[in-house]
């Protein structure tokens, strides 16, 4: 669950810290979290 903290909270600092991991692994996300990973973590966490 800790992996997806950035998904839940709109904290930009957390997003920046964890961005690279999520960008690399975004295709291997858990099914329930896939939407979050794709939309929020692609293209430099654009949604934040």
UniProtKB/Swiss-Prot annotation:
Predominant location: nucleus
GO biological-process terms attached to the record: chromosome condensation; sperm DNA condensation
Gene Ontology MF terms: DNA binding
Organs and tissues of expression: Testis.
Assigned keywords, A-Z: Chromosome, Developmental protein, Differentiation, Disulfide bond, DNA condensation, DNA-binding, Nucleosome core, Nucleus, Spermatogenesis
Ubl conjugation as UniProt keyword: no
Database matches in Pfam families: Protamine_P1
Compartments it resides in: Nucleus; Chromosome
GO CC, any one term: nucleus
Subunit comment: Cross-linked by interchain disulfide bonds around the DNA-helix.
Function statement: Protamines substitute for histones in the chromatin of sperm during the haploid phase of spermatogenesis. They compact sperm DNA into a highly condensed, stable and inactive complex.
Protein family (similarity comment): Belongs to the protamine P1 family.
Name of the protein this chain belongs to: Sperm protamine P1
Species whose genome carries this gene: Cavia porcellus (Guinea pig)
Gene that encodes the chain: PRM1
């Amino acid at each position: 669950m800790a992996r997806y903290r950035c998904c839940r909270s709109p904290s930009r600092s957390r997003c920046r810290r964890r961005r690279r991991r999520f960008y690399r692994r975004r295709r291997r996300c858990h099914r329930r979290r896939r939407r979050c990973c794709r939309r929020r973590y692609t293209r430099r966490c654009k949604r934040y």
